[in-house]
Amino acid sequence: MKILFTSLLFVMAGLSVGAQENLTYQKPPKEILELVDVQRAPSVSMDSKHMHMLLMYRNAYKTLADLSETELKLGGLRINPKTNISSTVTYVNNLKYKKLKDKEPLQVKGLPQNAKLANFSWSPDETKMAFTNTTATGVEAWILDIPTLEAKKLTEATLNANIGNPVTWFRDANALLVKMLPANRPALINTADAIPAGPTVTVSDGTKAQNRTYQDLLKNKNDEANFESLTTSELQKVTLSGQKSAWAPAAMYSSLSFSPNGTYIMVTTIQKPFSYIVTLDRFPNKSVIYDNIGKVVTTFNEKPLIEDMPKGFMAEEKGRRDIGWRADKPATLVWAEALDGGDPAVEVPFRDEVFELTAPFNGAPRGIVKTINRYSGITWGNDAIAILSDNWWNTRNVKTYIFNPSDASRKPEIIADYNYQDVYSDPGNFDTKRNQWGRYVLNMEGNNAYLTGDGFTPKGQFPFIDQFDIKTKKKTRLYQSKYTDRKESINSILDIKKGEVLVQMESKNQYPNYYINNIKKQKPTQVTFFENPFKKIENVSKELIKYKRADGLDLTGTLYLPAGYDKTKKEKLPMIMWAYPAEFKDKNSAAQTTSNPNDFTYPNYGSPIYWVTRGYAVLDDASFPIVGEGKEEPNDTFIPQLVADAKAAID
């Protein structure tokens, strides 16, 4: 929870009950309203070649009508039962299209009136975009044809979008696999009026276990029945002309994942029994492999209900987890299994092992690599090269390995070993590119791969691109940003031979825009031209300040002062300080600066920045580190350090 300090105490006294009953929603003062009631710049979705841009426009905030709609909280989900989609969705209300190097965007044609668009998904050939539109009665499936910029409705409002994206493209891009509401769906139970048939019974078997507190849990049999009704769908194949055909019968479908070549699909369904102490991601589930016409190939995995986990953040479930398709193969499943029983207290040389199984999935799984820490992912290259990462929360350690996925006898080589909170030592992430199956694999030129990093240093933030020689393991810096008057963020490498890189640039008063930066010629070319919607605070003073805690720990915060404030007079102002305590395992990491004074000033929901227009000083994102070195945990001295952090900022 964020901590808000203010020098003013607001007291409401002497208000009668009648006055409270007659109170209506109020508009904020003019200075704040001018920052709230603005047309914000769109978000951007690009194809893999970064040639086509879809501009997505949203309202800045939800309306009171949106916030007043019916909401059911079940099993970790928040659902609008009238429309069958998550009640937390932020909708898009308009779409425009732009070629990367064109200056002006074009309006998409054929969109519905009062559009409430969500669940966007590029087709495998990237010539179309699927999305949903939410009406007063439900969710429709739509597609956008990129060459013509024509949007078209495919279905009526019969989709079930209560769990995840309800539309999934077939590999040929000629049809969608859609979650539909069942024909004979049971009516929901009104839990406020329903009389229970019996008591709610939970069983304790005496097993020692640790569980966190979850929100929105199931509470009784009526909740169970409603959860099952709301999450049950039928799968139908819907062509681009709108023709529908049954694909799979009603079940609680949680995820659908086609193999890279589109021949197979892994279908995961929620099973019973449900739980009253954990959310749906810990409910039993079953993963079945189908072919692309809906015929069952094999049951790949059955996960039981997981209510009990070992103690610790690095505890894991037993059995197969993190199941997915290998990106560089047509149809190979990959997953991890804990070698320590999922218990971080067990001392073992390797925590996890990664396995693979190739279609038709009737052979024995093959172990391909083991990890010292807990497995966290693989970036695939080819038969001989892949990049593996693991992590261990207790020490904040991250390791990156290069390994040969075809030869498990060859020991993986560690190429990075660092504390992930030590941002000054972060080596960056390997750049990827889309392959023939539409999956992202290592971006390689000969023996070279490429890393892009945020570039935090003691002197500021300077993002970089490194060339990594896979044979020699040596790195060569190809580019490092030198801007001190603006912030540059590396988005993607477009063409390493030409030196073309897609970046974003911004400053305190310049909205983030995309540029093509030729790193060989050091010449950026602007490709989007989004305007600053918050010009009313252009003259506000913004400064990254540095100060020390009583024990000498370096701290930072972003200080905003009202426009026209004369610093030389040192006139006292009421101040709002906004902070979030963060845990660290060493003082070196805790003292590092991760803020950039050139970040665009973006007042969003819950931001204290609005109040600088009302004469307040605002200290935003003040450092509140809680350090526990060695065997000492941060929580051991949480309160004293919290007080010291606040005192340092105020003093």
Model-derived features: positions:
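Sec-dependent N-terminal signal peptides
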Residues: I3-L15
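Beta-propeller folds
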Residues: S7, A19-K523, F529-N539, D554, ...
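Conserved functional loop/turn residues at catalytic and ligand-binding sites
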Residues: S16, D145, G615
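Serine-hydrolase catalytic core recognition
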Residues: Q271-K272, D328, T379-W380, A384, ...
